[in-house]
UniProtKB/Swiss-Prot annotation:
This is Trans-aconitate 2-methyltransferase. It is found in: Cytoplasm. The gene is tam. It is an enzyme of class 2 (transferase). It catalyses: trans-aconitate + S-adenosyl-L-methionine = (E)-3-(methoxycarbonyl)pent-2-enedioate + S-adenosyl-L-homocysteine. It comes from Yersinia pestis.
Length: 258
């Protein structure tokens, strides 16, 4: 798959950063020494962490060279490394492992989440936020377009790139035996978008990537045209002309045992 596009991702940075801010607000530790930002992207979440904990040894981790370059330019005094989160092992037990909108791209959560929790220092915190929107009209439309067009065979596996997040009960059962406390909640954000095209532009940077990457440029344009037509109907204009994009997200904050 092609590398991520930081400029496209930042088009809706305020909306993308709001859940990161909400996740950070639920972290109660005061003076963490070691912090890792897993899937740091262009550094918007890392910047929040740096402002909150300026004295911590903070490392941003991502698999995208383009995102890491953007993050390093944004925060030249912070450390960023390229790594696969599945394979990542910190050199020190972490006081805070923070993962905003990244772990939903990874598989094998029953192994991954306990593994991340085991890499915390005593009283450390694992803080996770994941989009939980695969059943939303925006993502159902992706699958519908993929199944109805000349790209059908090419995109047979595109929908499998991102697995549906597990239930809150499942994550609790994975973490609770190894944690002092586990807090889980779900929030649905309603983003007023100026147009149906704006919704498509938002998703081009994230959810649509597995569908567009295997296609030729001409097929990408045709796919997006078909997708826009469905989005236009799925998100009708409200009284002020805007489209309301519902975006549910799952939050998990697990506190390591002492």
């Amino acid at each position: 798959m092609q590398d991520w596009d930081p400029d496209l991702y930042r088009q809706f940075e305020a909306e993308r950063t709001r859940p990161a801010t909400d996740l950070l607000a639920h972290i109660t530790i005061t003076s963490p020494q070691f912090i890792s930002d897993l899937g740091c992207g262009p550094g918007n979440s890392t910047e929040l962490l740096h402002r909150r904990f300026p004295d911590a040894q903070l490392v941003g981790i991502d698999h995208s060279q383009a995102m890491l370059a953007s993050a390093q330019q944004r925060l030249p005094h912070c450390t960023f490394i390229e790594a696969d989160i599945h394979q990542w092992r910190p050199s020190q037990p972490q006081n805070l492992i923070y993962a905003n909108a990244s772990l939903q791209w990874l598989t094998d959560h029953p192994h991954l989440f306990p593994s991340l929790l085991s890499q915390l220092a005593p009283r450390g915190v694992l803080a996770v936020q994941m989009p939980d929107n695969l059943d939303q009209p925006s993502h159902r439309a992706m699958r519908e377009v993929a199944e109805n067009g000349p790209w059908q065979q090419t995109l047979q596996e595109a929908g499998a790139t991102r697995a549906k997040v597990l239930s809150a009960n499942h994550y609790y059962d994975l973490l609770a035996p190894h944690a002092e406390r586990v807090d889980i909640w779900r929030t649905t954000y309603y983003h007023p978008m100026p147009s149906a095209q704006a919704i498509v532009d938002w998703l081009r940077a994230t959810g649509l990537r597995p569908y567009l990457a295997p296609l030729t440029e001409a097929m990408q344009l045709a796919f997006l045209q078909n997708y826009l037509a469905i989005i236009d109907k799925a998100y009708p204009a409200r009284t002020d002309g805007r489209r309301l994009l519902a975006f549910p997200r799952l939050f998990i904050v697990a506190h390591a045992q002492r």
